Curated annotation (Swiss-Prot):
<dbReference type="GO" id="GO:0103016">
    <property type="term" value="F:tRNA-uridine 2-sulfurtransferase activity"/>
</dbReference>
<keyword id="KW-0808">Transferase</keyword>
<dbReference type="InterPro" id="IPR023382">
    <property type="entry name" value="MnmA-like_central_sf"/>
</dbReference>
<keyword id="KW-0963">Cytoplasm</keyword>
<dbReference type="InterPro" id="IPR004506">
    <property type="entry name" value="MnmA-like"/>
</dbReference>
<dbReference type="GO" id="GO:0005737">
    <property type="term" value="C:cytoplasm"/>
</dbReference>
<feature type="disulfide bond" description="Alternate">
    <location>
        <begin position="114"/>
        <end position="210"/>
    </location>
</feature>
<keyword id="KW-1015">Disulfide bond</keyword>
<keyword id="KW-0694">RNA-binding</keyword>
<dbReference type="InterPro" id="IPR046885">
    <property type="entry name" value="MnmA-like_C"/>
</dbReference>
<dbReference type="InterPro" id="IPR014729">
    <property type="entry name" value="Rossmann-like_a/b/a_fold"/>
</dbReference>
<feature type="active site" description="Cysteine persulfide intermediate">
    <location>
        <position position="210"/>
    </location>
</feature>
<keyword id="KW-0819">tRNA processing</keyword>
<dbReference type="GO" id="GO:0002143">
    <property type="term" value="P:tRNA wobble position uridine thiolation"/>
</dbReference>
<feature type="binding site">
    <location>
        <position position="138"/>
    </location>
    <ligand>
        <name>ATP</name>
    </ligand>
</feature>
<dbReference type="Pfam" id="PF20259">
    <property type="entry name" value="tRNA_Me_trans_M"/>
</dbReference>
<comment type="similarity">
    <text>Belongs to the MnmA/TRMU family.</text>
</comment>
């Protein structure tokens, strides 16, 4: 049997596709394209978090106005549209872990957790319950057949590449998901929206983190976890106490501005010692990292990660969403998985993701990745930090 444009058997009219509609231009165009191709399209919008009934905030996702936009687009396309209340689930699976992670001194990525749990787990099950053959989203990433399964690849438009946030997508989810925009540049998507007469054609893009008002992480974390705002010392990596801070929630590894001390030398946050409420700062070279150890790994390679050769596997690693993939070596031994960064990176923080690729091009395959549990700096800085933390632990025990 021949395959349709979604690589599924059967004619489009016999293929039901649930489209995850956020109310933005991307998911709206996905619904429009699939409807135009003759698929049996069903739109579903998740109500995840709202700062006020039907109050739109630029950069939010799935708030009141966004839900109304998704409804209007669905109506104009002539497809059924359902709104599912996932606020409690979103709080449990995304917001609370986000706050807990910050309290422990990490720099979490809530969008990964949202995709991993709510969007690609709960919503996927909803799509199956609706009898859908696939779940389509407006993410900028590509998938294509790889033997009996499907593999992920970077999109054509690398400026919109969302593979960093989708590394935790499981093989089962990848096989069921479809990403119709992966081969299109964003500008063309807007043009298609205009051609279709969609009301959201000129709508501003979301900024992903829907539950953080005006981008102030500290506000919501302080409300959920007041202990994150406990004051403490700002300490130089060489052991000098330089000043005080109003809570580690206001800092992140790699930060330079707004540290709150003036010493005549450029200082950066190099470590958040959550156990002792300390912000540890140092020179830029103290941020340089060449090795990161991963946890909660989602490996999407063809062979098990435990079968990596003794010398490791040459890959390209991305340690921040805004940075390009850089040469690295992936290693696995004695139950540990780590990545050696050939050129080193600065500002790497626990809780961030390290995503692995076959190469640095926009056709690169996504091999998955993991969350950064810890990292190792240049030997001198690493030893200074270990000594500082160890001495504090010994003093506390005494």
């Amino acid at each position: 049997m021949s395959l349709n444009s979604l690589d599924l058997p059967g004619k489009p009219e016999d293929t039901r596709v649930v489209v995850a509609m956020s109310g933005g231009v991307d998911s709206s165009v996905v619904a429009g394209i699939l409807k135009r191709e003759g698929y049996d399209v069903v739109g579903v919008t998740l109500q995840l978090y709202d700062h006020g009934a039907a109050v739109h905030r630029a950069g939010s996702c799935c708030a009141g106005q966004d839900i109304e936009d998704a409804r209007r687009v669905s109506e104009s396309l002539g497809i059924p549209h359902y709104v599912l209340d996932y606020e409690a689930r979103f709080r449990e699976a995304v917001i609370d872990p986000f706050a807990n992670s910050y309290v422990s001194g990490e720099t979490p990525i809530p969008c990964v957790s949202c995709n991993q749990t709510v969007k690609f787990a709960d919503l996927l099950q909803t799509a199956r319950d609706l009898g859908a053959d696939a779940l389509a989203t407006g993410h900028y990433i590509r998938s294509r057949a790889n033997g009996a399964h499907r593999a992920l690849y970077r999109p054509v438009d690398t400026d919109r590449d969302q593979s960093y946030f989708l590394f935790a997508t499981t093989q089962e989810q990848i096989d069921y998901l479809r990403f119709p925009l992966g081969h299109l540049p964003k500008a063309q998507v807007r043009e298609i929206a205009e051609e279709m007469g969609l009301t959201v054609a000129k709508k501003q893009d979301s900024q992903d983190i829907c539950f953080v008002p005006q981008g102030k992480y500290s506000d919501i974390i302080s409300k959920l976890k007041p202990e994150a705002a406990n004051p403490g010392d700002i300490v130089h990596i060489d052991g000098r106490t330089l000043g005080r801070h109003d809570g580690i929630v206001h800092y992140t590894v790699g930060q330079r501005r707004g540290i709150g001390v003036a010493t005549g030398e450029p200082l950066y946050v190099v470590h958040l010692d959550a156990a002792n409420a300390r912000v540890i700062v140092g020179p830029r070279e103290a941020l340089e990292t060449h090795k990161v150890f991963l946890r909660d790994i989602n490996w999407l390679g063809d062979a098990p990660i435990s079968d990596l050769p003794e010398g490791g596997m040459e890959v390209f690693a991305k340690v921040r969403s805004t940075r390009p993939p850089r040469p690295a070596v992936l290693r696995h031994a004695d139950g540990q998985t780590w990545v050696e960064l050939v050129d080193g990176e600065s500002g790497i923080a626990p809780g961030q993701a390290c995503v692995l690729y076959s190469d640095e091009s926009n056709t690169a395959r996504v091999f998955g990745g993991g969350f950064i549990g810890r990292s190792e700096r240049e030997p001198q800085a690493e030893e200074m930090l270990r000594r500082l933390v160890a001495n504090t632990a010994s003093a506390s025990a005494a």
